[in-house]
Regions:
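Flexible, polar/low-complexity N-terminal or interdomain linker segments that lie immediately upstream
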Residues: 1-35, 63-66, 70-77, 105, ...
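Short hydrophobic beta-strand that contains or immediately precedes a catalytic carboxylate
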Residues: 20-24, 37-40, 213-214, 260
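Glycine-rich phosphate-binding P-loop
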Residues: 146-149, 186-207
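Conserved NTP phosphate-binding and transfer environment spanning the P-loop NTPase/kinase superfamily
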Residues: 279-286, 290-391
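Conserved nucleotide-sensing/catalytic segment adjacent to the nucleotide-binding pocket
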Residues: 207-280
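Catalytic cysteine-centered active loop of the rhodanese-like fold, especially the PTP/DSP P-loop
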Residues: 69-73, 78-95, 105-124, 135-165
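Short polybasic linear motifs
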Residues: 91, 97-101, 129, 135, ...
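A short glycine-rich beta-strand->turn/loop micro-motif centered on a GG-aromatic cluster
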Residues: 161-174, 214-219
Length: 391
């Protein structure tokens, strides 16, 4: 079998149902990668560094020889690692469900898809089978679509796998990801002061078959000083962008497709919403769910009062400069006295002030913002109020 080189669009098309192997080093993969890819490093971080040094200080040929020294003894291990990954990956994946851009009729058969996308010919889908069945198709990429992916693809092809490699490698994928943020989207923004349950509203809309993008979920952060509590560590900026681009690309958006997001500042924890996408959000209608202060305070106390005091104190200290020395100390003292509600009252006043400033700091704000008066942090009731306001 021959190794096939395919474009990033075709690579992503097939990746919906096929195994993606990223053969870059563990450090490169950890920094950022194509979502749902598996790391099968041809070289570890130390080996990659040695090869790079040889390339810079000696020659390309010497660097290749170093690479062969590392690659040769590991060929069997690489193949066996792929077999283990395939065995785990195959569970639960039983059919090929190709989503091809431009084919609006779901009844189009595979032969039609082959005609439009020749790349899918002879694809063997992951399907739990006896050990004697034909090995499935595998997608392989490295940084620039060069020697690393070529070497692994050659080895796996030799062993019997059907292999596709990505033209331009991960770098081509990154260019594709950044292109997603330059597109125009028909956004609708769910707004509300801190403690309004906006994320719950967003996912309630999703359950009713509306398209959403949960920026805070992708960022592993709820946006405020307390937003990291209860969340896993944030991804890198690059990985956040990859996740966001993938999410946007899965929404079959036509110009009329509505996508709901929460109202956010450009910064979510340590991450930044890509500037072009954020500008698009700032031009979108905002449905501001206006809930009384005390109701939101009760909700916030219930949500965050369960966390250890030490973590709460550390979170408050991170905004000390903006909160002010006196208010910071008061908020911490209330925490130490187990008076969570009064501590959070100070924080909520602070965030209400800053949210109001950000809410109206957009062009044409008076026409974009629709105020929706609500009495409780109640997802079911507030979704109905949103519907009454013609979202």
């Amino acid at each position: 079998m021959a190794v096939n080189k395919i474009t990033v669009e075709d690579f992503l098309l097939l990746s919906k149902n096929l195994l993606v192997l990223d053969v870059r080093s563990p450090g490169e993969f950890k920094h950022a990668h194509i979502p749902n890819a598996y790391n099968l490093p041809l070289f570890n971080d130390e080996e990659r560094a040695k090869i790079g040094t040889a390339y810079k200080q000696q020659s390309r040929e010497e660097a290749i020889k170093f690479g062969l020294d590392f690659f040769g003894p590991n060929m069997r291990t690489l193949v066996e690692n792929v077999e283990r990954i395939v065995a785990g990956y195959g569970e639960g994946v039983s059919s090929l469900r190709l989503r091809v851009t431009g084919l609006d009729n779901p009844k189009k058969n595979i032969s039609t898809i082959k005609k439009n996308k020749a790349v899918v010919k002879d694809v063997q889908v992951f399907n739990p089978q006896p050990a004697t069945s034909q090995p499935p198709t595998i997608l392989v990429h490295c940084w620039r679509g060069g020697m690393r992916s070529a070497a692994v693809a050659w080895l796996l092809d030799l062993y019997g796998f059907k292999v596709y490699t990505l033209i331009g490698g991960y770098k081509a994928y990154r260019n594709w990801a950044l292109e997603q943020f330059a597109k125009e989207y028909n956004f609708r923004i769910i707004g509300g002061y801190t403690g309004s349950g906006k994320t719950l509203l967003l996912h309630a809309l999703e359950k009713e078959n509306n398209a959403i993008v949960d920026l805070e979920g992708l960022a592993h952060h709820k946006g405020s000083a307390l937003g990291a509590l209860g969340n896993p560590p944030q991804p890198t900026q690059e990985m956040f962008e990859n996740l966001l681009a993938e999410k946007l690309s899965t929404i079959n958006h036509q110009p009329s497709t509505t996508i709901y997001l929460e109202d956010e500042s450009q910064r979510i924890g340590n991450l930044q919403i890509p500037i072009q996408l954020w500008y698009c959000m700032r031009k979108a209608p905002v449905y501001f769910v206006d809930i009384p202060f005390e109701e939101r305070l009760n909700y916030l106390t219930d949500e965050y009062g369960i966390h250890p005091k030490e973590k709460l104190v550390n979170a408050i200290m991170r905004i000390q400069k903006r909160l002010g020395g006196l208010e910071t100390q008061n908020a911490i003292n209330f925490l130490l006295e187990n008076n969570f509600k009064e501590s959070f009252r100070i924080l909520l006043h602070y965030y209400d002030k800053w949210y109001t400033k950000g809410l109206y700091n957009r062009e044409n704000a008076e026409n974009l913002i629709k105020n929706i008066a609500a009495t409780l942090v109640n997802t079911e009731q507030n979704i109905e109020l949103i519907k009454l306001n013609n979202i």
